[in-house]
From Swiss-Prot:
<dbReference type="InterPro" id="IPR011545">
    <property type="entry name" value="DEAD/DEAH_box_helicase_dom"/>
</dbReference>
<dbReference type="Pfam" id="PF04408">
    <property type="entry name" value="HA2_N"/>
</dbReference>
<feature type="compositionally biased region" description="Basic residues">
    <location>
        <begin position="1"/>
        <end position="10"/>
    </location>
</feature>
<feature type="modified residue" description="Phosphoserine">
    <location>
        <position position="190"/>
    </location>
</feature>
<comment type="subunit">
    <text>Part of the 43S pre-initiation complex (PIC) that contains at least Met-tRNA, EIF1, EIF1A (EIF1AX or EIF1AY), EIF2S1, EIF2S2, EIF2S3, EIF3A, EIF3B, EIF3C, EIF3D, EIF3E, EIF3F, EIF3G, EIF3H, EIF3I, EIF3J, EIF3K, EIF3L, EIF3M, DHX29 and the 40S ribosomal subunit.</text>
</comment>
<dbReference type="Pfam" id="PF24385">
    <property type="entry name" value="DSRM_DHX29"/>
</dbReference>
<dbReference type="InterPro" id="IPR056890">
    <property type="entry name" value="UBA_DHX29-like"/>
</dbReference>
<dbReference type="GO" id="GO:0016282">
    <property type="term" value="C:eukaryotic 43S preinitiation complex"/>
</dbReference>
<keyword id="KW-0378">Hydrolase</keyword>
<keyword id="KW-0175">Coiled coil</keyword>
<dbReference type="GO" id="GO:0045948">
    <property type="term" value="P:positive regulation of translational initiation"/>
</dbReference>
<dbReference type="InterPro" id="IPR011709">
    <property type="entry name" value="DEAD-box_helicase_OB_fold"/>
</dbReference>
<dbReference type="Pfam" id="PF00271">
    <property type="entry name" value="Helicase_C"/>
</dbReference>
<protein>
    <recommendedName>
        <fullName>ATP-dependent RNA helicase DHX29</fullName>
        <ecNumber>3.6.4.13</ecNumber>
    </recommendedName>
</protein>
<keyword id="KW-0963">Cytoplasm</keyword>
<feature type="compositionally biased region" description="Low complexity">
    <location>
        <begin position="43"/>
        <end position="53"/>
    </location>
</feature>
<feature type="modified residue" description="Phosphoserine">
    <location>
        <position position="69"/>
    </location>
</feature>
Length: 1365
């Protein structure tokens, strides 16, 4: 009612903001409604001012420039340097938005709509957006474009921020830096204007003549006050609905132009008239009625605008309706409430009433002393003013005669510039009642909302309640009128949503049915197009087998078949042929337990094939699949069986009954009925054909090795057996633990086959050293120094001036006294005892192997014994290293020796040579891994040298990755290796470990499924639709712990491979299931391929699976660190290794072997490790290309190794982040005052604080940012190994769940990684995530699709490369 009136110097936007803010102060106290209450806070209102008290003046403070925020968090964030800012070039930003919008147009599929949407929820969403001060049209566009696609409030905000221009965004959302004052609302408001704000209850006042004590105001001031009153009235009429619901922002008020608004309304009015005329012609009464309502609404608002003080009369338009129709006269109750807000002068009001001759509202408010003993309203008002306004004079009462009735004008001076004047329109029969009624109305205005009316006489109490009820009704009517367009829009939108929801429910069964079908060309086809054709065996019948049977009979009659048949008959397994075949006819599952060398791997599949082809009865299938754990086994066994069958064309030839299939290589034909394949190939076949419909017999060989793939395959086969009664399963194992497999398959029969072996004499390390005369030098690389780790110490150095400087140094710490020697070794020489005590058991002594080989040829005991030497080594690197030593040692130059390396990555010719007998007088030396334990048999081996080491897949909790680590073998494996020496005659086994160590070996190796991460297994389970991984793996032979499975699923969710709430693969997960590598490495490789940098990424991935090529010799740590620092690049250990690799390749190409060796020595690099990196890199690249991805020709086309450019580094760091996330931490930058002082880099990770390892190039890094790390290890403290400094873009593009905090201008990743960003940029990154998923989905649907010219990838690549450039 009454408002504060203060002199203004000039009308303007600030005054408008001040006045409107005053009119809304009370509504601001209620807060925003709906989701805005909890999720997106709006600005806090000013504290309420007690009635009658003066408002405190806001103290002028220093101006602060920052991104405008709705609360303190945003501002504080801007002051925190550790929260990095994200900025995109303006032109690039516009292009990215164009790509996003284009993608949305092309992919306009509507998402699932929530069935719980209601009009109330839509209204809450509408009002929440309205509370953010978005315009009505923008709100409606946003809701239409997002809710119909399954969106919510966040989706609508994202749409608005992405599609509105910066100047169209409300305050707090725009991208520009804005000026703000602490705790000021509205912004940029001067102290003088703020002081004029009136309390919420005084927004409806009537200006009367001034008190003589108050100085008369100038005409200019009156105009300004009129402007303020007009704004208050307009705000009241337009925004009545906001009372009690929430405060609205000031964007529209700050930019309000009545003339522009008037012209807009005039245009809309003309449109509405044309629409009404059209409806009239169409006789559409409903449409005509709606159009008339619009016309009336526009006209009312235009009339209001015409009263604006700065309205330009030149643009005023005359319309008939405006001239004819006048606003309806207010009711007496409304007049009594003075709800018109802006009454004209008393004289004008009486004159108007006189003209209209309206009947007066005359009432009697008399009450007796008996009915009321309290104060009268007049006395109550006087006492209230004295108490609450002690500096103000007593209220004045001016009686006004209206005919024979009375009313009273009451005047209350609240302050020098604030006078409340009220005059009720209700008339009384005497002057005293009029004074009491005026006092009641004054109290109603002064203490509105309080229960003062209970202290008044009953008659005045009733009129008070009457006023209150009428005011509420009026507010409700105004609210309904104002909200009518909104409610109409919500009703239409809700109707559309329900219609779309019904359509989705009708289409869902069809889509689910279609979704179960495999795409026409699925991703498995690109594992190897021809490979899967080999496993896609055609269904066979008796007629189909006729040509094959005829072929087999022809082969049986060949001399080659008959000659090899005699050799087969000498094998131990051959005499069990009939029992094996008969048992298989009676039982569907059989376990064949045979010793190594019994011939089971070649003969059991051969027996089955012969029986099925020679059996003329029935029309049984004949498609046999025999799985092998290694590729070399599959190839060599298939080759041998082909020879035994008499096939001249070899495996997979035109007239061959036997073939093989390994990764990226297939040898099979139409006549193939026996297929040897790796376990992984059959698992991929199961992803395509879950029941193996075309297979009649499955033979799983080497099940005793308990690889994770074979255990997984057994679970699937056990379930298939319950669904297919015609499938037969044969498990072939060494004699170890065969009963366990029988029990797993409901106590199926076991056929035990003895082996053919001769006695083997065993020599242990102590015997070998004693006999060969080997001397272990103290400076030898194989001599144990008992060094465990380096300890960090702090040294205080006092300078001449008395200052103290601290230095951090690392000194080697010994583990203590040397271990005591077992008394058992006292019988050996002191030289042997010294060797046993100090020889490093964890390092293979290649020098000792050379001495032993020489000893075999020189000692009288062995030099006359013919036979091959089989050396068991842990991996390819050791094979290559020993091969190089033998090749360069002149003692082995002569033709007396034939050195053969046996490994699955080597050529087929080299592998074939291992199985051939050498010429007489030539000693064959075969270097092999544990594949020679049981997988293959080299027929002429007499000597076995067992290093006792093997490589096992092991999970590292520190890096959440698995890798092949070197470890000791089990007793069972050692005995298998020993047995290889006794196949043709009495043999000899030389163990390069002591007898005491052998006794400490485990009896059996731990099943792989219990010691490796299960991410890859979970991917296969979900890919094959086998249900929940937890439920499926509980059926395994040795079920892993639920926590391990849960960890695997959590990691898959983190990297985006499966859906967050169900065991279902995402597009990325579908691709990762096609790569038999660790999921983190797989993700790196996929992103490396799609961003055109597969070669360097494959090298980085190889580094993660193998050990670092950098070495630190004892006593040369400083030199090694200096050499590593010279190769350091881009604050990254990973890129430093790649830089070293590039230098090695360059030296290799330019200077040959000598230059290569010199480069490695100069930079402290292990050449063997670099060779291993090269081999693993090539293998990984083959895997990725086989899965349908190819690297960019531009990168592969580079001539020779080149230095990394800035753009290359940015791209490689982004791909590293894609693979290693969430192994990331925030650098706790603590810059020292002394520039020479080096502080260790401290990092805050999600699990706590850690320190960068001393071996890292980032050890002394001190800057704000985020650090990727490969591994987290705990020594005396927690260290991060292999780290890389990354920028915000990679984290935002490839990190965890991203959330946009619109008002705070913050981006959060996984709820703890924060970046500052204008809201539009924040939404861009959120949308780019969706685009990356869409690219992967398209690639999944069409594996042959080229990604080289994809617009989405091009724009993302450009974005990454231009960061900070």
């Amino acid at each position: 009612m009454g408002g504060k009136n203060k002199k203004h110097k000039a009308p303007g936007a600030a005054a408008m903001r001040a006045a409107v803010s005053a009119s809304r102060a009370r509504s601001a106290e209620a807060g925003a409604v709906g989701e805005a209450q909890s999720k997106k806070p709006v600005a806090r209102p000013a504290p309420a001012v007690p009635t009658g008290a003066r408002e405190p003046r806001v103290k002028q403070g220093p101006k602060i420039y920052s991104f405008n925020s709705a609360n303190d968090s945003g501002g504080s964030a801007n002051l925190d340097k550790s929260i990095l800012k994200v900025v995109i070039n303006n032109k690039l930003e516009q292009r990215i938005i164009g790509v996003i919008n284009e993608h949305k147009k092309q992919n306009s599929d509507r998402g699932a709509i929530s069935g719980r949407l209601s009009a109330k929820k839509l209204q809450d969403l509408y009002m929440a957006l309205q509370a953010f001060s978005f315009k009505t049209k923008d709100i409606e566009d946003a809701m239409t474009n997002t809710l119909l696609h399954g969106g919510d409030l966040h989706s609508a905000l994202d749409w608005l921020c992405l599609n509105l221009s910066d100047d169209a965004l409300p305050e707090g959302f725009s991208q520009e830096f804005e000026e703000q004052q602490p705790k000021s609302r509205p912004k940029f408001q001067s102290v003088q204007i703020q002081a004029t704000l009136s309390p919420p209850q005084q927004t409806k006042t009537k200006r009367q003549e001034e008190d003589p004590k108050i100085k008369p105001k100038k005409e200019e001031t009156t105009v300004e006050v009129n402007m303020k009153e007009w704004i208050l009235r307009y705000a009241e009429q337009q925004d009545e609905e906001e009372k009690g619901e929430g405060s609205k922002g000031l964007e529209e008020e700050e930019k309000f132009d009545p003339n522009q608004r008037y012209l807009n309304l005039a245009a809309r009015l003309l449109d509405a008239k044309e629409q009404a005329a059209a409806f009239k012609l169409e006789k559409n009464k409903q449409g005509q009625k709606e159009a008339q309502e619009k016309i009336r609404k526009f006209q009312r608002e235009m009339e209001t605008l015409e009263d604006h003080p700065i309205f330009n009369p030149a643009i005023k338009i005359s319309h008939q309706q405006n001239e004819k129709k006048k606003p309806a006269p207010a009711t007496e109750a409304e007049s009594a409430l003075n709800l018109n807000l802006f009454e004209k002068s008393a004289a004008a009001t009486e004159e108007e009433k006189g003209k209209k001759k309206e009947p007066h509202d005359v009432r009697n408010f008399d009450y007796t002393a008996r009915s009321w003993t309290g104060k009268s309203p007049k006395q109550f008002l006087i006492d209230w003013v004295r108490k609450n306004l002690p500096k103000s004079p007593n209220p004045s009462f001016e009686k006004v005669a209206v005919g024979r009735y009375w009313k009273c004008r009451v005047r209350v001076v609240r302050s020098e510039d604030d006078v409340l004047v009220v005059c009720p329109t209700i008339l009384t029969e005497d002057g005293m009642q009029a004074q009491h009624l005026g006092a009641t109305l004054a109290l109603y205005r002064l203490v509105k909302g309080q229960s003062v009316h209970q202290l008044l006489p009953p008659t005045y109490r009733d009129v008070w309640l009457e006023w209150s009820d009428e005011e509420k009704k009026r507010e409700e009517l105004n609210k309904m009128e104002t909200n009518k367009p909104r409610d109409l829009f919500i009703a239409k939108l809700l109707n559309k949503l329900k219609q779309q929801q019904q359509q989705q429910q009708q289409q869902r069964p069809e889509s689910e049915k279609g979704g179960s079908e495999d795409p026409e060309e699925s991703w498995e086809n690109l594992v190897s197009d021809e490979d899967l054709a080999a496993l896609s065996l055609e269904p066979t019948s008796a007629e189909d087998l006729a040509p094959v049977r005829s072929l087999f009979r022809r082969l049986q009659s060949t001399p080659k078949y008959q000659r090899l048949l005699k050799e087969r008959q000498q094998l131990p397994v051959f005499k069990h042929r009939d029992s094996i075949v008969e048992t298989l006819k009676r039982h569907r599952v059989v376990v064949v337990a045979g010793e190594t060398g019994s011939g089971k791997s070649t003969q059991v599949p051969h027996f089955l094939l012969e029986d099925l082809l020679l059996d003329e009865c029935g029309a049984r299938k004949c498609n046999i699949v025999c799985t092998q754990p290694r590729r070399i086994s599959a190839v060599s066994l298939a080759t041998r069986v082909c020879e035994e069958l008499g096939c001249e064309s070899g495996p997979g030839g035109r007239n061959s009954l036997c073939g093989y299939q390994i990764r990226m290589e297939s040898r099979a034909s139409e006549s193939t009925r026996l297929l040897y394949c790796t376990t992984g190939v059959l698992l991929r076949k199961l992803q395509e054909d879950g029941l193996l419909a075309d297979v009649s017999h499955v033979i799983v060989d080497e099940v005793h090795e308990r690889s994770v793939q074979s255990d997984f395959l057994l679970v699937i086969l056990k379930e298939i057996l319950q669904k297919r009664s015609d499938l037969h399963l044969i498990l072939m194992s060494a004699t170890v633990d065969s009963d366990k497999f029988s029990t797993y398959f409901t106590h199926c029969p076991i056929l035990r086959i003895s082996g053919r072996s001769y006695p083997v004499e065993v020599f242990h390390l102590e015997d070998i050293v004693e006999e060969t005369g080997f001397v272990l030098e103290k400076d030898s690389e194989y001599c144990q120094k008992f060094l465990e780790e380096e300890e960090e110490i702090t040294i205080n150095v006092t300078s001449k001036a008395g200052g103290v400087k601290k230095y951090q140094e690392y000194i080697p710490v010994q583990s203590g006294a040397s271990p005591e020697l077992n008394p058992f070794y006292q019988k050996y020489s002191s030289r042997t005892q010294h060797a046993i005590l100090y020889m490093n058991p964890h390092k293979i002594n290649l020098d000792l192997i050379l001495e032993l080989l020489v000893y075999l040829d020189k000692s009288p005991q062995f030099r006359n014994i013919e036979g091959a030497v089989l050396i068991f080594l842990p991996g390819l690197a050791h094979i290559q290293q020993l091969y190089d030593l033998l090749s360069s040692d002149r003692r082995f130059y002569s033709e007396r020796y034939q050195v053969i390396a046996l490994h699955s990555v080597l050529s087929t010719q080299d592998q074939a040579a291992a199985f051939m007998f050498p010429p007489p007088g030539v000693r064959k030396i075969v270097l092999a891994t544990n594949i020679a334990e049981t997988g293959i048999t080299i027929p002429d081996v007499v000597f076995v040298i067992d290093t006792g080491r093997t490589k096992e897949n092991k999970y590292h909790e520190s890096s959440q990755m698995s890798s092949l680590v070197e470890t000791f073998v089990s007793k069972a494996s050692a005995l298998q290796r020993q047995g290889r020496a006794g196949r043709v005659r009495d043999g000899f086994c030389f163990r390069l470990y002591t007898r005491e160590r052998f006794e400490g070996f485990l009896d059996y190796s731990v099943p792989e499924i219990l010691r490796v991460p299960l991410e890859e297994l979970c991917l296969h389970i979900m890919k094959c639709d086998l249900g929940s991984p937890e439920d499926f793996l509980s059926k395994a032979l040795d079920p892993p712990q639920l926590q391990v499975i849960s960890n695997a699923m959590n990691l898959l969710r983190k990297i985006g491979a499966c859906e967050p709430n169900e065991p279902k693969l995402t597009p990325l997960g579908q691709h990762l299931a096609a790569l038999p590598v660790n999921v983190k490495i797989g993700k790196m490789l996929i992103f490396g391929a799609i961003f055109g940098c597969l070669e360097p990424v494959a090298t980085l991935a190889a580094v993660m699976t193998e050990k670092s090529p950098f070495i630190t010799p004892i006593g040369r740590k400083d030199e090694a660190d200096l050499a590593k620092s010279s190769l350091a690049v881009a604050d990254s250990d990973h890129l430093t290794i790649y830089n070293a690799y590039l230098g090695w390749k360059k030296a290799q190409q330019e200077g040959g072997f000598r230059s290569e060796i010199s480069y490695c020595q100069r930079n402290f690099l292990n050449r063997t490790s670099l060779l291993t990196l090269e081999d693993v890199k090539q293998e990984l690249m083959k895997l990725v290309k086989a899965a349908g991805f190819s690297s960019s020709p531009s990168w592969e086309g580079r001539k020779g190794p080149q230095t990394l450019s800035f753009q290359d580094i940015a791209l490689l760091k982004a791909v590293l982040a894609a693979g290693l996330y969430d192994s990331v931490g925030k650098i706790m930058c603590t810059k020292s005052v002394d520039v020479t002082e080096k502080l260790a880099c401290m990092v805050e990770t999600a699990q706590g604080k850690a320190q960068v390892h001393p071996s890292s190039v980032n050890r002394d890094l001190q800057t704000y940012g985020w650090l990727l790390y490969q591994e987290k290890v705990r020594y005396t403290r927690v260290y991060l190994r292999e780290t890389t400094l990354i920028t915000p873009f990679p984290v935002l593009l490839f990190g965890g769940d991203i959330e946009v905090q619109h008002r705070e201008r913050l981006l959060s990743v996984d709820g703890w990684i924060y970046f500052q960003a204008p809201v539009k940029i924040a939404v861009i990154f959120k949308q780019l995530r969706v685009l990356i998923d869409s690219v992967l989905r398209k690639k999944l649907e069409n594996p042959k699709m080229s990604l080289e010219n994809d617009k989405i990838l091009q724009i993302i690549t450009e974005l990454i490369k231009t960061e900070n450039n």
